[in-house]
Amino acid sequence: MRSQLSLMGKKEGMIHVFDKDGNLVACSVISVGSNVVTQIKVDSTDGYNAIQMGANEINVPEKTLEKRMNKPELGHLKKSGSRVFGLLKEVRLSEDAINEVSLGNEFGLEVLEDISSVDISGVSKGKGFQGVMKRFGFRGGPKTHGSGFHRHAGSIGMRSTPGRCFPGSKRPSHMGTVNVTVKNLEVVKIDLEKKVLLVKGAIPGPRGSVVVIRRSSRAKG
């Protein structure tokens, strides 16, 4: 069951650590608090087996909740134990695994103790509106005097046949702020006391952003 779970954490930044062979390794630091089961969905009533997990618990007065939440949200909150979370995520589980979970169960980094590699998903850094040279690495035009353009894409069309530009060509547009998954990152260290996970290499998003950690899909066994 543990191998199917995903955990929500926060990217804290990057540091360097020495591995067993004395090599200096760049690592991403992820803080992972308690992930609490707030809802259980089963195939007989919901059409599939899954659990909803909450993280980043928030202390909110009851009167404030009644003002800011509608009745369906308040009803869901009462069923889950009246605990408010800043993050909610649904995780699919098998039929056997769903029977091992109860409402209110808490999971942390101990889920990853026997795992050597993980997949990490997050939202990439937003770069705003960018041209084709930054966004796609286009060469651009001649840099010399007399050139009609320097940083444009160049020709993207043809002659009278077909007489149009094909859709899907690379154009200037918004760059970043997309869901990105980095696969098969090596787990360097798990500190259960400080609730910190170190993985080798970079992960998506800026410091302070939310990432989802799961067992690597490329892991053997």
From Swiss-Prot:
Species for this entry = Chlamydia caviae (strain ATCC VR-813 / DSM 19441 / 03DC25 / GPIC) (Chlamydophila caviae)
Q: List the disulfide bonds.
A: none
Query: What this chain does, per the record?
Result: One of the primary rRNA binding proteins, it binds directly near the 3'-end of the 23S rRNA, where it nucleates assembly of the 50S subunit.
- Subunit arrangement? Part of the 50S ribosomal subunit. Forms a cluster with proteins L14 and L19.
Q: Which keywords appear in this protein's UniProt record, sorted alphabetically?
A: Ribonucleoprotein, Ribosomal protein, RNA-binding, rRNA-binding
The record, for HAMAP family, names: Ribosomal_uL3_B
Q: Which residues cross the membrane?
A: none
Q: Which GO terms describe its cellular component?
A: cytosolic large ribosomal subunit
The record's section on InterPro entries has:
Ribosomal_uL3 (IPR000597), Ribosomal_uL3_bac/org-type (IPR019927), Ribosomal_uL3_CS (IPR019926), Transl_B-barrel_sf (IPR009000)
Q: In which family does this protein belong, per the annotation?
A: Belongs to the universal ribosomal protein uL3 family.
Question: Residues annotated as region Disordered?
Answer: 140-160
One family from Pfam that matches here is Ribosomal_L3
Superkingdom is Bacteria
Q: Name one GO molecular function term.
A: structural constituent of ribosome
One biological process term from GO is: translation
Q: What is this protein called?
A: Large ribosomal subunit protein uL3
